[in-house]
């Protein structure tokens, strides 16, 4: 029997696209015979997993949880993608997404790369995902990952329909007082898709771009109405600031109108209970990098 070395495993993986554990098993069964191992892999349909990686996987589900931590609580959300919603809603796929989440939590992962590197039984999440592709017959991948920490963390998982798994997960970290309105804030995040917590969190380049667009649009509108340059220079800045204010109300969580009572903002909810929102995250299936 030929020795099953790392180089041999790498060779067969590169030639078949199969996962590491599948290659090890095939080589063991074939007693180190590469040609026979490749036949075993083909027979089991594992090779197809590598070929599927070039196909887009933008359906799927999001597994989420809250665990106790040194800082109080930590919320985790992991998106697992498939090619079709048919696969995404199967109990086995949802169960597998949950196992990936469990592995991420055990590893205290903070990024997609750390999730993929996390231990999963006697292999890694990356290898487990590759093997799942063969099981489900589709390209399967870990998509987005989010993590929030604070004294209190609230998680809300939204389903498009009863038979489908969660397609949006919203998480928010608050202080203890803010916990009283954290659920309402999580609902708001899910429904309205805020991008930043406060206006100070808006990146400078984003704000600069918005200001430039607002200025150009305002100037063109005033010119089209026949306003003289002197008038434009006088009134345009106020109009631009108004448009930036509208931008903040649309994209900044604490400045958004509360969906259940538009007469108040989300920030008002926290003021009413003397609480503070610390951070939040929103993950929606298919909204990460297309692949």
UniProtKB/Swiss-Prot annotation:
Q: Per its UniProt entry, which superkingdom is the organism in?
A: Bacteria
Q: Signal peptide: which range, if any?
A: none
- For the region Involved in Mg(2+) ion dislocation from EF-Tu, give the residue spans: 84-87
One Pfam annotation reads EF_TS
Where is it chiefly localized?
cytoplasm
Compartments it resides in = Cytoplasm
Q: Which InterPro entries match?
A: EF-Ts_dimer_sf, Transl_elong_EFTs/EF1B, Transl_elong_EFTs/EF1B_dimer, Transl_elong_Ts_CS, UBA-like_sf
Q: Which GO terms describe its molecular function?
A: translation elongation factor activity
> Which UniProt key words apply to this protein?
Cytoplasm, Elongation factor, Protein biosynthesis
Q: Which GO terms describe its cellular component?
A: cytoplasm
**Protein family:** Belongs to the EF-Ts family.
Functionally, this protein is described as follows: Associates with the EF-Tu.GDP complex and induces the exchange of GDP to GTP. It remains bound to the aminoacyl-tRNA.EF-Tu.GTP complex up to the GTP hydrolysis stage on the ribosome.
The protein's name in its UniProt record: Elongation factor Ts
The gene it comes from is: tsf
């Amino acid at each position: 029997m030929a020795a099953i070395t790392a180089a041999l495993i790498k060779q067969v993986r590169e030639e078949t696209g199969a996962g590491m554990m599948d290659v090890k098993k095939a080589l063991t069964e074939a007693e180190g015979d590469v040609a026979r191992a490749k036949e075993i892999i083909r027979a089991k349909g594992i090779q197809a997993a590598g070929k599927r990686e070039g196909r887009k996987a933008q359906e799927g589900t999001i597994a989420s949880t809250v665990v106790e931590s040194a800082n109080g609580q930590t919320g985790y959300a992991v998106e697992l993608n498939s090619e079709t919603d048919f696969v995404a809603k199967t109990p086995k796929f949802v169960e597998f997404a949950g196992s990936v989440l469990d592995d991420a939590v055990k590893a205290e992962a903070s990024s997609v790369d750390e999730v993929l590197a996390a231990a999963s039984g006697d292999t890694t999440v990356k290898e487990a995902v590759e093997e799942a592709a063969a099981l489900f017959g589709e390209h399967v991948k870990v998509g987005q990952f989010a993590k929030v920490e604070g004294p209190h963390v609230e998680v809300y998982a939204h389903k498009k329909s009863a038979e489908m798994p969660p397609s949006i997960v919203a998480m928010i970290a608050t202080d203890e007082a803010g916990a009283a309105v954290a659920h309402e804030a999580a609902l708001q995040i899910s429904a309205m898709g805020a991008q930043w917590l406060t206006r100070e969190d808006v990146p400078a380049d984003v704000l600069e771009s918005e200001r430039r667009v607002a200025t150009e649009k305002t100037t063109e509108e005033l010119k089209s109405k026949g306003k003289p340059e002197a008038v434009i220079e006088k009134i345009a800045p106020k109009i631009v600031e108004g448009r930036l204010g509208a931008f903040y109300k649309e994209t900044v969580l604490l400045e958004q109108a509360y969906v259940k009572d538009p007469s108040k903002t989300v920030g008002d909810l926290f003021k009413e209970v003397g609480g503070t929102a610390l951070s939040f995250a929103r993950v929606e299936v298919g909204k990460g990098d297309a692949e």
